[in-house]
Amino acid sequence: IDIKRIIEHLPRQRLGVLITDHNVRETLAVCERAYIVSQGHLIAHGTPQQILEDEQVKRVYLGEDFRL
């Protein structure tokens, strides 16, 4: 079973899911909104595009050269 495919179909059924994962590429590819936590503190939330553009997320979590 392809879990990514299942997750992509959940919004059509008006269902949501909470994913906790360190694989940012896979997670941002299937989510509508993301919440980024660093050292127990919420540092950013928004659409995948907003997360990718967030300077603090880049500095703390992704690095400047991160690309999807």
Curated annotation (Swiss-Prot):
It is a peripheral membrane protein. One of its GO terms (cellular component) is plasma membrane. Its EC number is 7.5.2.-. SUPFAM superfamilies: P-loop containing nucleoside triphosphate hydrolases. InterPro entries: ABC_AA/LPS_Transport (IPR051120), BCA_ABC_TP_C (IPR032823), P-loop_NTPase (IPR027417). Its main location: cytoplasm. One of its GO terms (molecular function) is ATP binding. Keywords: ATP-binding, Cell inner membrane, Cell membrane, Cytoplasm, Membrane, Nucleotide-binding, Translocase, Transport. It is found in: Cytoplasm; Cell inner membrane. Component of the lipopolysaccharide transport and assembly complex. The LptBFG transporter is composed of two ATP-binding proteins (LptB) and two transmembrane proteins (LptF and LptG). Belongs to the ABC transporter superfamily. Outer membrane lipopolysaccharide export (TC 1.B.42) family. Part of the ABC transporter complex LptBFG involved in the translocation of lipopolysaccharide (LPS) from the inner membrane to the outer membrane. Probably responsible for energy coupling to the transport system. This is Lipopolysaccharide export system ATP-binding protein LptB. It comes from Klebsiella oxytoca. The lineage of its organism: Bacteria, Pseudomonadati, Pseudomonadota, Gammaproteobacteria, Enterobacterales.
